[in-house]
């Protein structure tokens, strides 16, 4: 799935359903990015962020050839050559890194045969967060952190929101259509929640510093309530209003 990170959320725009186990291959990933470029333009790509499974020689080379900045996490046991030309696990280049310490490696490292900049952040319990990129950027970890928004999206599509997995659909065509409906519903719910938070009732911040309810859940609860009124009470004014706020003429409503 390819998503755009915007205002703390990931907006799903393109996806491929895989009739296989595991992750997408390089051809499938490139097809998604090409589709984005064809519709929105390459200049709209600020950075591509991805997890550890999305690496490879052809993939990295294609991103470089098309001048697409990337910040991609890599596995700590990935084999690389150290300064002496010896093959080691990449974590050995950062063996003395302390928790909370951030280091940008001094030279490019060949990853799958392609030179990349590598940055490392020491985490708790001797873990490492390793990010490969094709440009030097002091904010590489800030960029990579936005990848978490797609995990939030998945949780909204699944247990926290639409229970996508509980449909038990197996036919790819039906799953594809359902995912499209869920993507639209997610955007609608989030937009309604945003609209309410900004114009009607700002969130209360609890003692632990978190909002009392997520923007998505606020919008979803509002949509559910409106649909119940429409179907059970034949009262459609609220759902009609929620449809109207999808337009750009928000100020004229109310």
Tell me what each language-model feature is:
Residues 4-254:
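Single, function-defining residue in the core of a domain
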């Amino acid at each position: 799935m390819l998503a755009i990170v915007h205002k703390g959320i990931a907006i799903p725009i393109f996806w491929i359903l895989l009739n296989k186990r595991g992750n997408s291959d390089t051809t499938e990933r490139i097809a998604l990015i090409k589709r984005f470029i064809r519709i929105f333009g390459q200049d709209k790509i600020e950075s591509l962020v991805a997890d550890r499974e999305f690496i490879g020689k052809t993939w990295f080379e294609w991103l470089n050839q098309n001048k697409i900045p990337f910040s991609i996490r890599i596995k700590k046991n990935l084999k690389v050559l150290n300064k002496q030309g010896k093959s080691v696990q990449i974590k050995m280049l950062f063996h003395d890194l302390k928790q909370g310490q951030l280091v940008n490696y001094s030279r490019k490292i060949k990853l799958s045969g392609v030179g990349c900049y590598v940055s490392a952040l020491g985490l708790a319990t001797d873990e490492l967060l390793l990010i490969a990129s094709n440009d030097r950027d002091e904010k590489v970890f800030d960029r990579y952190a936005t990848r978490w928004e797609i995990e939030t999206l998945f949780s909204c599509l699944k247990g926290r929101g639409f229970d996508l997995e509980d449909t038990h659909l197996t036919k790819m065509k039906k799953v594809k259509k359902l995912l499209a409906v869920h993507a639209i519903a997610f955007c609608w719910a989030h937009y309604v929640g945003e609209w309410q938070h900004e114009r009607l009732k700002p969130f209360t911040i609890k003692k632990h510093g978190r909002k009392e309810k997520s923007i998505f859940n606020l919008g979803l609860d509002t949509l559910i309530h409106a649909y119940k009124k429409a179907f059970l009470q034949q009262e459609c004014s609220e759902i009609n209003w929620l449809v109207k706020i999808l337009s750009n003429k928000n100020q004229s409503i109310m």
